[in-house]
């Protein structure tokens, strides 16, 4: 199966103290990730504080990372919104950028469309680009989710709708997707670091990861071990990552991971409101988990 890679990091974005985008530091983070276990990057996703970024800043960051880092791995641009018209317009702009390998498109949030509305939303986007599309299913943030049957219909009509970041937390959904879309031309990625190993067992090919900012090599090694039939080694790595994964989600993402990135020396910069630094107790918890992990 040709995939975007095993470990795709949903990367943080670096901002200056005044809240403006720091492209140089963001590119440095991207290079670090690709040199330390990541096969590709998701740029300007939730972890990258996409809601607080302007369209112009997103386009500038997509362009810079594709140009400076695209030779090292897959570059996937997050382009989704809950308005179909503006999503289509943005997709057309992003599709013109050299070096973008795929698009991440979330199920429309807050307005909670039914399955027909979701189908028509993704249909309009698919007709606006030839780039591979990864659907992002995350009911906990969106308020609803795409059904495997809707996804299968989209893929049958638009083969470049060819991947999903599956973050429902329900292994049966991933299993049903693989049943309805058999073969190697559709990629299922875990959208939850802690469920990556069990997701592999029902047909996933990798993970869109947050913890890979600090544990990218181990995440990649775990997937490679599973693929090679070394299940006990994969389980050992999975268990060794449990505490650091838990620490990355003790409060809302990307608060823990951006704090952790600073602690390991990455130029992560400040948060843009409404995101803010972790509490003292949360920071202490993350510090302990990092110290234990790097031993």
Model-derived regions, located:
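Basic, gly/Ser/Thr/Pro-rich low-complexity segments located predominantly at protein N termini
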Residues: 24, 50-53, 85, 168, ...
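A general structural signal for well-ordered alpha-helical segments in protein cores
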Residues: 26, 58, 62, 87, ...
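Hydrophobic side chains within alpha-helical segments
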Residues: 19, 60-61, 168-169, 195-196, ...
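Short secondary-structure transition/capping segments
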Residues: 53-56, 89, 115-117, 146-148, ...
């Amino acid at each position: 199966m040709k995939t975007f890679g095993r470990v795709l990091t949903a990367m943080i974005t670096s901002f200056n103290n005044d809240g403006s985008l720091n492209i140089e530091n963001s590119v440095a983070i991207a290079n670090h990730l690709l040199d330390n276990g990541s096969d590709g990057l998701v740029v300007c996703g939730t972890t990258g504080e996409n809601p607080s970024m302007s369209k112009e800043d997103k386009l500038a960051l997509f362009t810079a990372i594709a140009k400076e880092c695209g030779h090292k791995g897959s570059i996937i641009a997050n382009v989704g919104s809950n308005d179909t018209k503006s999503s289509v317009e943005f997709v057309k702009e992003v599709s013109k950028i050299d070096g973008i390998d795929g698009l991440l498109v979330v199920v429309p949030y807050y307005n909670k469309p039914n399955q027909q509305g979701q189908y028509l939303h993704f249909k309009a986007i698919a007709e606006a680009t030839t780039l591979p599309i990864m659907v992002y299913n995350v009911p906990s943030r969106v308020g609803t989710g795409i059904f495997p049957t809707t996804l299968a219909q989209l893929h049958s009509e638009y083969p470049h709708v060819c991947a999903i970041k599956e973050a429902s937390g329900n292994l049966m959904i991933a299993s049903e997707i693989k049943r309805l879309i058999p073969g190697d031309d559709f990629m299922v990625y875990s959208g939850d670091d802690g469920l990556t190993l069990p997701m592999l067992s029902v047909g996933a090919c990798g993970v869109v990861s947050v913890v890979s900012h600090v544990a990218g090599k181990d995440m990649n090694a775990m997937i490679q071990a599973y693929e090679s039939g070394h299940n006990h080694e994969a389980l050992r790595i999975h268990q060794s990552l449990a505490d650091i994964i838990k620490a990355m989600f003790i409060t809302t993402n990307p608060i823990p991971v951006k704090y952790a990135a600073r602690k390991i020396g990455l130029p992560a910069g400040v948060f843009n409101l409404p995101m803010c630094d972790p509490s003292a107790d949360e920071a202490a918890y993350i510090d302990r988990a990092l110290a234990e992990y790097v031993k």
